[in-house]
């Protein structure tokens, strides 16, 4: 068995793969400011699968913002950057992939891939308005449980136009639209569309978007976001299997 670990600021993900690079088990854990504890919790979740397999972990690789800290704790020198890990998983799971869109809790990435190799990439600079944490904050502002944002967005009749704005301006616009009587479903739809526009206009910008675009990251749990991406990309869009743990899967493949 091989283990991949992706330690991010929002979530910590672990993936176990077998000799044919198939996923044996995986888990998605909230980091909650304590990556070491999150990894320990993840290993406990995977322990029954490891015990059942009856074989040891041959190698572990770590990626994510906390990769050096956790690699040291796990006693491995297999460390890789997040761009490489995300591209590796996308290319393995979608061999025709030429573009990867990955949106996480605190950052978002654009990756251009050719024959499985990274040829270009970009990450969000400062604005958080194209990331998962922003949606979570606005869900709290609207008084809506986070899992309900997507379904409510899909029920919208007249999505509110929030435009492409930075975090502060978008928050102000949401408050003013609420005060003006906008429905929460329409606001949810506007929020999802605006997140996608912010990502495309502030991260991708003028970068090449190919014909097979793999969408990855925990934000895909939000159906409203996925729908907004489909509106803009059509049948070029692919939802990568294991989309919320692709960083850890890519690390496992490199282990």
Task: Give names to the regions the model predicted.
Residues 66, 203-229, 243-247:
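Glycine-rich phosphate-binding loops at beta-strand->alpha-helix junctions
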Residues 77-83, 230-249:
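Conserved phosphate-binding/catalytic loops in two-lobed NTP-binding clefts
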Residues 2-37, 41-44, 121, 125:
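Short glycine-rich, Thr/Ser-proximal phosphate-binding strand/loop in the N-terminal lobe
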Residues 170-203, 244:
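Adenine-nucleotide phosphate-binding core of ATP-dependent small-molecule kinases
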Residues 88, 132-136, 227, 240-255:
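Glycine-rich phosphate-binding/hydrolytic loop that grips phosphoryl groups
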Residues 34-35, 115-158, 253:
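Glycine-rich phosphate-binding loop plus the immediately following alpha-helix
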Residues 27-31, 50-83, 112, 119-120:
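Short beta-strand-loop/turn "lid" adjacent to the catalytic site in phosphate-handling enzymes
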Residues 42-58, 199-211:
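Phosphate/pyrophosphate-binding loops at sites that engage ATP/ADP/AMP, CoA/4′-phosphopantetheine
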């Amino acid at each position: 068995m091989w283990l991949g670990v992706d330690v991010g600021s929002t979530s910590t993900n672990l993936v176990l793969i077998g000799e044919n690079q198939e996923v044996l088990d995986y888990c998605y854990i909230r980091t909650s400011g304590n990556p070491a504890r999150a990894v320990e919790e993840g290993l406990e979740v995977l322990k029954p699968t490891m015990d059942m397999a009856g074989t040891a972990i041959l190698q572990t690789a770590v990626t994510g913002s906390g990769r050096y800290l956790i690699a040291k704790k796990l006693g491995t020198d297999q460390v890789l950057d997040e761009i490489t890990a995300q591209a590796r998983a996308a290319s393995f799971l979608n061999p025709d992939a030429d573009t990867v869109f990955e949106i996480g809790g605190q950052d978002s990435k654009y990756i251009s891939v050719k024959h499985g190799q990274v040829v270009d990439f970009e990450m969000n600079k400062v604005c958080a308005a194209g990331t998962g944490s922003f949606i979570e904050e606005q869900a709290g502002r609207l008084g809506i449980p986070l899992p309900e944002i997507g379904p409510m967005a899909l029920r919208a009749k007249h999505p509110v136009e929030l435009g492409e704005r930075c975090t502060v301006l978008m928050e102000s616009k949401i408050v003013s639209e609420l005060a003006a009587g906008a429905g929460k479903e329409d606001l949810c739809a506007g929020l999802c569309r605006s997140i996608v526009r912010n990502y495309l206009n502030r991260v991708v910008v003028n970068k090449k978007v190919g014909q097979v675009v793999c969408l990855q990251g925990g934000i895909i749990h939000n159906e409203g976001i996925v729908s907004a991406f489909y509106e803009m990309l059509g049948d070029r869009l692919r939802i990568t299997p294991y989309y919320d743990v692709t960083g850890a899967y890519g690390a496992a493949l490199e282990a």
